[in-house]
């Protein structure tokens, strides 16, 4: 994976940004905003189409994000539409854009000063504008009414990675970028064909250029194109539409993802941070959600800790783990910051510092640093810099995550559910233990059985952590269970100076000023799957710190002898990635893929899955860093919205991936 380089800008005599790489302006010197409105909104008939649009979400694709002017302009127009048409079917705008050389945040802010009327929207974008990390960044705005998927990287690499189903995902294309004469590499038949693959039937397209090869290329890709009057003094531009689309999907048949059919009600089984984030994402999409939780209140399971570290799980090879956790961590930051505007919960973006405490950890972290991640995401610190960063003496180098920190998952989860409980389309049923799920073929509904009674729902999500084996449908999913104990230690004058979450062969949080305790942990115990206090784990948590930091007196001040602690059971996967998506029918999959290695690609059947049954499981010890994006992914899938990760990364999260990998190698999967 190539690293992302920021755009190199100059500013011409009228204050318009000019690309040094392409020697071209980002927008018209005369009136860039009016040009956007004319070329992309008017010629794509957007105002008229919104009036009669018959789906909940309208999706726009754009080939060059640049300054974000097109996005801000269409967002402004959409807000006007919503105010004027509160009862319209269309409720949500989704904007998917690509950018090889993203502007730095400072340059973006400067560019936006040209349009005071967009200042309020621009400020919202600035707040969540991502660092230069490759692939898709999902930014959810206006309580879910507006979504921006910003893909960072060369569009020739990104476009083939965008997942889509048989119907396509794009309702309108903004074919924008630097002029074809300035950036010939982008304007080619592969681009036009890629746009066509993502387009829905009746998808419209417009572009400022009138170049003949662009018009012919779009026609070859399947669009009906024509020349129209250009903006201002420009004589011509081109616009058109895709009249019909051939059904096709980018998902491999054995990693197929389907949305829920005939969706009118959804049951979520769980009560942790993943369930809360999922319920929020679904309710924002207008869905009716009922939560079933066996406990008296939320966050009684693995999400119940006082303080949890939030930072990405990265590696230098940029494998699936790194490609999931980099955007997931950044999405968690966004999710938490937005939640904090309305809710109260303990958290602090104080940074996370990972010590190079021995040769093995040093080699591992150096290998991670070889991945050339953006400095906003990760930095190497000398021993002196580490001491300054954490606020305590230390004689070790480290890796620092400046955007990381800690939060109280119990408080966040409970606050999210309390907020949801004020809404008409959310119901929480606590102390309701779901015993069985039965699919009623006649009504095409799931029966959710609890203590001698049942209710019916069109879709069900299993998000109950380590208790996933309660249900026959998920009993064979290859996930493990690990007990963890976190110790709570009282503040001392010295320990109160810790300014960053500290990671080593364990972790320690800064003192929470609201309770004058810090957290240190956490144990890993696969043998004793209970939630009883473990005196050995309590001692082990303290000893890990003194073993990794043997030469500092402050490490010995951590006092766990009061036996203050919390225990929970993690739901973990072998490959450290969650299981998110459709629940596979294990027995049927074994039969249908019994001879998978010898089956021709075109003859492979779509994987057998239970109808309208989904799971969000296996978040392990990094659930705080992954749950919000995994929930957003699943809500998007259930509701047939664009998905926020590359298609090959989605395969790494597929709930049936372990079975499929074995079957593709011709191995038996009696158990995993």
UniProtKB/Swiss-Prot annotation:
Q: Where in the cell is it found?
A: Cytoplasm
Keywords carried by this UniProt record: Cytoplasm, FAD, Flavoprotein, Methyltransferase, Multifunctional enzyme, Oxidoreductase, S-adenosyl-L-methionine, Transferase, tRNA processing
* Location of the region described as tRNA (mnm(5)s(2)U34)-methyltransferase in the Swiss-Prot/TrEMBL record: 1-243
Known EC number(s)? Answer: 2.1.1.61, 1.5.-.-
* Disulfide-linked positions: none
Origin, by domain of life? Bacteria
> Which terms under GO biological process does the entry name?
methylation; tRNA wobble uridine modification
* GO cellular component terms listed in the entry, alphabetical order: cytoplasm
Q: Where is it predominantly found?
A: cytoplasm
Q: Residue ranges of region FAD-dependent cmnm(5)s(2)U34 oxidoreductase?
A: 269-672
What are the required cofactors?
Answer: FAD
Please give the Gene Ontology molecular function terms for this protein.
flavin adenine dinucleotide binding; oxidoreductase activity, acting on the CH-NH group of donors; tRNA (5-methylaminomethyl-2-thiouridylate)(34)-methyltransferase activity
Q: Which reaction does it catalyse?
A: 5-aminomethyl-2-thiouridine(34) in tRNA + S-adenosyl-L-methionine = 5-methylaminomethyl-2-thiouridine(34) in tRNA + S-adenosyl-L-homocysteine + H(+)
Query: HAMAP family, alphabetically?
Result: MnmC (MF_01102)
- Similarity annotation: In the N-terminal section; belongs to the methyltransferase superfamily. tRNA (mnm(5)s(2)U34)-methyltransferase family.
The entry's protein name is: tRNA 5-methylaminomethyl-2-thiouridine biosynthesis bifunctional protein MnmC
The scientific name of the source species is Vibrio vulnificus (strain YJ016)
């Amino acid at each position: 994976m190539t690293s992302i380089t920021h755009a190199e800008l100059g500013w011409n005599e009228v204050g318009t940004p000019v690309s040094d790489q392409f020697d071209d302006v980002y927008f018209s010197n005369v009136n860039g905003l009016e040009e956007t409105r004319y070329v992309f909104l008017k010629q794509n008939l957007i105002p008229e189409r919104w009036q009669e649009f018959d789906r909940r979400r309208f999706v726009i694709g754009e080939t060059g994000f640049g300054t974000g002017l097109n996005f801000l302009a269409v967002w402004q127009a959409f807000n006007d539409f919503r105010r004027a048409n509160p009862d319209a079917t269309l409720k949500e705008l989704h904007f998917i854009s690509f950018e090889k050389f993203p502007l730095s945040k400072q340059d973006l802010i400067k560019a936006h000063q040209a349009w005071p009327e967009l200042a309020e929207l621009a400020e919202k974008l600035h707040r969540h504008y991502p660092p230069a990390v490759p692939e898709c960044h999902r930014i959810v705005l206006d309580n879910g009414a507006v979504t921006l998927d910003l893909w960072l990287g060369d569009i020739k690499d990104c476009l083939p990675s965008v997942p889509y189903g048989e119907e396509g995902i794009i309702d309108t294309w903004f074919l924008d970028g630097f002029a074809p004469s300035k950036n010939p590499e982008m304007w080619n038949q592969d681009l036009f064909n890629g746009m066509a693959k993502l387009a829905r039937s009746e998808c419209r397209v417009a572009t400022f250029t009138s170049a003949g090869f662009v018009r012919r290329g779009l026609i070859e890709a399947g669009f009906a194109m024509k020349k129209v009057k250009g903006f201002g003094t420009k004589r011509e531009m081109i616009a058109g539409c895709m009249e019909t689309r051939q059904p096709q999907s980018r998902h491999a048949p054995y990693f197929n993802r389907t949305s829920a059919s005939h969706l009118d009600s959804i049951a979520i089984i769980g009560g942790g941070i993943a369930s809360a984030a999922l319920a929020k994402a679904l309710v924002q999409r207008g869905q009716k959600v009922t939560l079933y939780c066996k406990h008296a209140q939320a966050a009684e399971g693995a999400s119940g800790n006082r303080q949890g570290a939030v930072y990405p799980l990265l590696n230098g090879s940029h494998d699936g783990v790194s490609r999931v956790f980099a955007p997931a961590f950044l999405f968690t930051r966004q999710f938490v910051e937005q939640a904090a505007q309305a809710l109260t919960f303990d958290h602090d973006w104080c940074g996370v510092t990972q010590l190079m405490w021995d040769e093995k950890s040093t080699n591992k972290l150096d290998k991670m640093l070889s991945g050339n991640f953006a400095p906003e995401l990760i930095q190497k610190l000398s021993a002196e810099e580490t001491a300054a960063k954490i606020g305590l003496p230390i004689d070790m180098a480290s890796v620092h995550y400046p955007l990381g920190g800690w939060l109280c998952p119990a408080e966040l989860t409970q606050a999210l559910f309390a907020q949801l409980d004020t809404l008409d389309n959310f119901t929480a049923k606590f102390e309701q233990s779901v015993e069985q799920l039965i699919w009623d073929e006649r009504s095409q509904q799931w029966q959710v059985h609890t203590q001698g009674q049942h209710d019916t729902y069109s879709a069900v999500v299993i998000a109950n952590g380590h208790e996933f084996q309660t249900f026959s449908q998920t009993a064979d999913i290859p996930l493990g269970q690990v007990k963890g104990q976190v110790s709570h230690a009282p503040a001392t004058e010295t320990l109160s100076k810790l300014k960053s979450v500290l990671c080593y062969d364990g972790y320690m949080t800064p003192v929470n000023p609201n309770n004058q305790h810090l957290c240190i942990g956490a144990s890993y115990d696969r043998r004793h799957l209970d939630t009883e206090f473990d005196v050995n784990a309590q001692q082990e948590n303290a000893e890990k710190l003194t073993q990794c930091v043997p030469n500092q007196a402050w490490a010995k001040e951590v006092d766990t002898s009061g036996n203050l602690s919390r225990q929970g059971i993690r739901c973990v996967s072998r490959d450290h990635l969650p299981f998110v998506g459709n629940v596979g029918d294990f027995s049927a999959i074994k039969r249908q893929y019994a001879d998978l290695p010898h089956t021709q690609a075109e003859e492979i059947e779509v994987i057998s899955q239970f109808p309208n049954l989904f799971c969000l499981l296996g978040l392990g010890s990094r659930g705080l860093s992954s749950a919000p994006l995994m929930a957003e992914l699943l809500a998007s899938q259930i509701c047939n919205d664009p998905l926020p990760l590359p298609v090959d990364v989605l395969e790494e999260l597929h709930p049936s991936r372990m079975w499929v990998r074995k079957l593709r190698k011709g191995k038996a999967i009696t158990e995993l």
